[in-house]
Amino acid sequence: MNAFNRSEIHALTFSQEVDPCELQANEVLDIVLSRRFGVEYQPIVEVQAGEIVGYQAAARFWTKDQRILNAGRMFACLHKNPLLLFHVELELKKLQISQFPGSGWLILDLDIDSFFEGGASLQNPFLQLFKEYAWSDCELIINVVENHNMADAHRSQRMIELLQQSGTAVALEDIGVRWGMFSLSAFLDASVIKFNGLALKALNESAAQATLDWLVSAARRIGVQTILDGVSTCEQFDWARRMGVDCVQGSLFARQVIQVRNS
């Protein structure tokens, strides 16, 4: 499928998002128990061919009256209750995998706290779920989501080890552009590394170019795929091509209209 064919892919337009922090605790609980959550698949486009090679699944939440919640703030609320966080993450992963519309990469975000609520062994329910789809048409890649503290740097490495031992590929996000879990070991262990285009924009042009050039060159030498996120203009797409990035992602490419609601 050609990523630029707007007759095949249509943009999803959302109304203004609601901050979950404005809701009562019983309203947040009702969203979880009533399964008012779903998934949006965001295309990942190969730079040279302009073709979709996979999708990244994004969580979506709704209130009882069908208002859209800010997903990031919703997860922040769920972090206050580890059991609810674990439950929602596991149910979302089941949904995101089962409703995947095609083949190729399926990148799933997985929070470190959610993952370790399931234990630090190969019996972790997330690992068991991913193993069920090891031979499916989609290639699961888990994007390790950290909370940016020193403890997470160590837990991230352990999470990567467990994912690899269970046969699941790993993606690392925002490499080299903000403080996080970057380490040589993590860099070498990843199958995919993602760069945040918005963070790169915050750098001056020469710094952004030098950062991306160094990281892309290193990734190419060790066989790691690269994705530049936050691509919203043709100029940014052309820049990614010149810099040798393998794939891009962002609002330039309309999201596929596959959005699952459980009501």
Regions flagged by a language model, labelled:
Residues 1-36, 47-51, 61-64, 147-149, ...:
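EAL-family c-di-GMP phosphodiesterase catalytic domain
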Residues 38, 54, 105-109, 139-143, ...:
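Structural preference for beta-strand elements that scaffold enzyme active sites
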Residues 40-75:
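A short, well-structured catalytic beta-strand-centered motif of the EAL phosphodiesterase domain
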Residues 75-85:
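Short histidine-centered catalytic/ligand-binding loop motif
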Residues 85-155:
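Catalytic core of bacterial c-di-GMP phosphodiesterases, primarily the EAL and HD-GYP domains
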Residues 130, 157-167, 213-220, 241:
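Surface-exposed amphipathic alpha-helices with a cationic face
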Residues 177-179:
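Short, solvent-exposed loop/turn at the beta-strand->alpha-helix junction
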